[in-house]
């Protein structure tokens, strides 16, 4: 099963940490965010990974070559970050027609990916409540677990 990891952003909110290091290669403890996500998807049965890169993409590429030689990882380069939709269009030749998981490289999570229905033709969106320090967002999760948008 395929997974696309979105790793092309500038990481502006993490400056100055991301001036020389791409956000996916920032460490939490002894492990980068990207490593944590790659290991998580591999351990959940994803055997083909597509990663888009842009800002400091050469550093991500070098990291992957050093650490994931034995895994099927395809890099899709962007001259500048295209955003989520642009990244998917740019990578369309690698995505195919099968079900695919799309995640952000800079997300720290422990979501049980086995809960996703891999045979469905619909989209699953995994969301979490906005934290108290950042209450603005595009959508929220109500007490019933349903997604809603504030007007």
Could you tell me what each predicted segment is?
Residues 1-60:
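N-terminal glycine-rich phosphate-binding loop and ensuing alpha1 helix
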Residues 61-143:
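Conserved beta-loop-beta/alpha segment of the NTase-like Rossmann-fold superfamily
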Residues 149-151:
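Conserved FAD/dinucleotide-binding core of flavoprotein oxidoreductases
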Residues 145-147:
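Hydrophobic residues embedded in beta-strands of well-ordered beta-sheets
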């Amino acid at each position: 099963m395929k997974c696309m990891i979105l790793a092309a952003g500038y990481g502006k909110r993490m400056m100055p940490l991301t001036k020389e290091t791409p956000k996916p290669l920032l460490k939490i403890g002894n492990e980068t965010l990207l490593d944590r996500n790659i290991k998580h998807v591999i351990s959940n049965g994803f055997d083909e990974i597509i990663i888009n890169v842009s800002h400091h993409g050469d550093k991500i590429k070098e990291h992957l070559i050093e650490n994931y030689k034995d895994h099927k990882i395809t890099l899709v380069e962007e001259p500048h970050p295209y955003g989520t939709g642009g990244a998917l269009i740019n990578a369309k030749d690698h995505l195919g027609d099968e079900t695919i998981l799309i995640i952000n490289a800079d997300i720290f999570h422990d979501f049980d990916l086995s809960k996703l229905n891999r045979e469905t033709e619909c989209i699953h969106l995994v969301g979490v409540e906005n934290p108290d320090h950042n209450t603005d967002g595009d959508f929220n999760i109500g007490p019933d677990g349903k997604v809603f948008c504030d007007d």
